A protein has these predicted regions:
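Hydrophobic positions on the alpha1 helix immediately C-terminal to the Walker A/P-loop
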Residues: 41-42
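Hydrophobic anchor at the beta1->P-loop junction of P-loop NTPases
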Residues: 31
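Short beta-strand-centered segment that lines the nucleotide-binding/catalytic pocket of NTP-utilizing
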Residues: 53-68
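Extreme N-terminal, non-catalytic leader segments
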Residues: 1-28, 96
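Conserved glycine(s) of the Walker
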Residues: 37-38
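Conserved catalytic-core segment of NTP-binding enzymes
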Residues: 115-217
Length: 266
């Protein structure tokens, strides 16, 4: 039986020549986790970084109660209402648009939203995306609270949405200041069979650094590049020279810490 040349396996996607950016497959990136674990903050960084490097990314803000991404990216797509039928139709149209446009897509739903889980169950979503030349990537954002691992279990159980490109992000912001990151996360790593399952299929763990002046950037609704360059919005003054340096160092540290999974990002 012949092989359909239009069908691309996830294994093929993960083993392409990543040195050539033009051949990197478009990415379907799905960040997930409880509230205040850093997924929207990361999303802002990864979209801004990709676009600054000339890579096109479709931004989808599916959080119907708190559309933070839309405040930073005016072109972000959002559902017209919180009705589940409307949200599901919007999500499916996004996927079709991505397949046709060959652009990367990042979808940020509110904590607890089940739209992707339903699609993953109904469509075998990771296989479907891979077959259309899209690399599925899921990023789980967790803190030291063992309850944070519940989301991982829900995606990993029965391989609901468990692509080869799976990243676990420990957010230092969620750790009490007096506790070292290695100690805060040691028990969850050592005792979690689901984390070991992800690592056994070559998933990755990344510790996301803290940006000390993040609240000042958010007050101004600035992008990170804007903040580092001394821009501002409204009546607030621009960041001081020291905080601008903090932003630049944080940006460099983010690039470094995510370097092992750079080919999995938009």
């Amino acid at each position: 039986m012949g092989t359909n040349p239009d069908i691309v396996s996830e294994h093929d996607l993960l083993n392409e020549d990543e040195e050539h950016i033009g051949t990197r497959p478009p990415v379907f990136l799905f960040p997930t986790g409880r509230g205040n674990r850093g997924k929207t903050f990361f999303t802002r960084w990864v979209v801004e970084d990709a676009r600054n490097m000339g890579r096109e990314v479709i931004v989808a803000d599916g959080d119907c109660t708190n559309q933070t991404l839309s405040a930073y990216f005016p072109d972000a797509s959002s559902p017209s209402s919180a009705d589940q039928v409307t949200v599901t139709k919007w999500f499916e149209e996004l996927i079709e648009a991505q397949i046709k446009s060959r652009k990367s897509l990042i979808v940020d739903f509110g904590a607890g939203d089940r739209t992707l889980k339903h699609a993953a169950h109904d469509l075998s979503l990771d296989t479907f995306l891979s077959h259309h030349g899209i690399r599925p990537v899921v990023i789980h954002f967790v803190g030291p609270d063992p309850d944070d691992l519940a989301s991982l279990h829900s995606f990993e159980t029965g391989n609901l949405f468990a692509p080869a490109a799976t990243i676990i992000v420990y957010n230092q912001f969620a750790i009490p200041p007096h506790v070292p990151p290695s100690a805060a996360f040691a028990n969850s790593v050592a005792k979690s069979t689901v984390i070991q399952q992800i690592l056994d299929r070559d998933g990755e763990i990344v510790v996301m650094p803290i940006l000390g002046c993040a609240h000042e950037i958010e007050r101004r609704r600035l992008g990170f590049i804007e903040a580092a360059e001394g821009q501002t919005k409204g009546d607030l003054p621009s960041l001081g020279l020291i905080d601008r340096q903090r932003v630049r160092l944080w940006q460099a540290e983010m690039k470094s810490r995510f370097s092992n999974v750079a080919s999995w990002l938009p």
